[in-house]
């Protein structure tokens, strides 16, 4: 069997960093990263980006050396992705924060609304209902992170956790401050508005969970294989007939319901910002599906049926 020689150079300086001799033809990029780490332990595999061209795209971990457009002496270019952190840790941190922060305002701990309101309770039923809905939402997210989601990428840059937490934690504090404020005014149309909003919220939360379960069943544990998601017998998954990312559709719907329930401007703004970001993600996933699968259903839109 003919072995390969792999030379790894810095993508910026072109400096030679490592020379690997007698590499198996069936070796994957993941295995090459592990070999590279032995000579440069400060760059663990998750921190490495290897590519065929200094300005090219990163090679996938599952790419096999002999299937790449290289000779028996291959040159790969290395870029440092920076310190990495697992997606599970990021999500748990992102979602635990809003859950805890919101409850601080709900229980009116000292130094928030003034001494006379310390640990007092709102007289409005909608305030207590909003707390239950908000808490349920983030507890659901935490449990899904631990037991449902399967991540195609194991890590993300450490710096992103600060940006993400600022977004989630900041908005949670902002909306919680107004919803739990002693001077909070209930929705204009009273109980009927709250009931309608609660129905929207519950339906969308069930829908979101159903989509996450369907996506989980689509990818075997430990696998990175992608398949076209289709509706199942669960009616909540039928939205797959019309959109590529119904989990985002239901997520936006949940926050719209919460905004109607609380009639609170910060919640409406959070819904708008979230919708904008999820639309970007949905369009990206939709393009990936179209590129990867020639038989992808043509009727589907990224996030909103027939529109967007």
Curated annotation (Swiss-Prot):
Query: Can the keyword Nucleotidyltransferase be found in this entry's annotation?
Result: no
Q: In which tissues is it expressed?
A: Expressed at high levels in brain and is also found at lower levels in several other tissues.
Q: In which pathway does it act?
A: Lipid metabolism; fatty acid biosynthesis; Lipid metabolism; sphingolipid metabolism
Catalytic activity line of the entry: a very-long-chain 2,3-saturated fatty acyl-CoA + NADP(+) = a very-long-chain (2E)-enoyl-CoA + NADPH + H(+); octadecanoyl-CoA + NADP(+) = (2E)-octadecenoyl-CoA + NADPH + H(+); (2E,7Z,10Z,13Z,16Z)-docosapentaenoyl-CoA + NADPH + H(+) = (7Z,10Z,13Z,16Z)-docosatetraenoyl-CoA + NADP(+); (2E,7Z,10Z,13Z,16Z,19Z)-docosahexaenoyl-CoA + NADPH + H(+) = (7Z,10Z,13Z,16Z,19Z)-docosapentaenoyl-CoA + NADP(+)
Q: Where are the transmembrane segments?
A: 87-106, 125-147, 159-180, 190-216, 246-262, 265-292
Q: How is it modified after translation?
A: Glycosylated.
Which regions of this chain are Cytoplasmic-facing, per the record's topological domains?
1-86, 148-158, 217-245, 293-308
The enzyme's first-digit EC class, named in words, is oxidoreductase
Localization of this protein: Endoplasmic reticulum membrane
How this chain sits in the membrane, per its record, is:
Multi-pass membrane protein
Q: Which Pfam families does the entry mention?
A: Steroid_dh (PF02544), TECR_N (PF21696)
Residues recorded with modification Phosphoserine: 58
> A GO BP term, please?
sphingolipid metabolic process
What is the E.C. number?
Answer: 1.3.1.93
Mainly resides where?
Answer: endoplasmic reticulum
Q: What does the record give under GO molecular function? A: oxidoreductase activity; very-long-chain enoyl-CoA reductase activity
> Which keywords describe this protein according to UniProt?
Acetylation, Endoplasmic reticulum, Fatty acid biosynthesis, Fatty acid metabolism, Lipid biosynthesis, Lipid metabolism, Membrane, NADP, Oxidoreductase, Phosphoprotein, Sphingolipid metabolism, Steroid biosynthesis, Transmembrane, Transmembrane helix
InterPro entries (UniProt xref): 3-oxo-5_a-steroid_4-DH_C (IPR001104), SRD5A/TECR (IPR039357), TECR-like_N (IPR049127), Ubiquitin-like_domsf (IPR029071)
Topological domain ranges for the Lumenal compartment: 107-124, 181-189, 263-264
Known role: Involved in both the production of very long-chain fatty acids for sphingolipid synthesis and the degradation of the sphingosine moiety in sphingolipids through the sphingosine 1-phosphate metabolic pathway. Catalyzes the last of the four reactions of the long-chain fatty acids elongation cycle. This endoplasmic reticulum-bound enzymatic process, allows the addition of 2 carbons to the chain of long- and very long-chain fatty acids/VLCFAs per cycle.
Q: Name the family the entry cites.
A: Belongs to the steroid 5-alpha reductase family.
Q: What is this protein called?
A: Very-long-chain enoyl-CoA reductase
- Biological source species: Rattus norvegicus (Rat)
- Gene name as annotated: Tecr
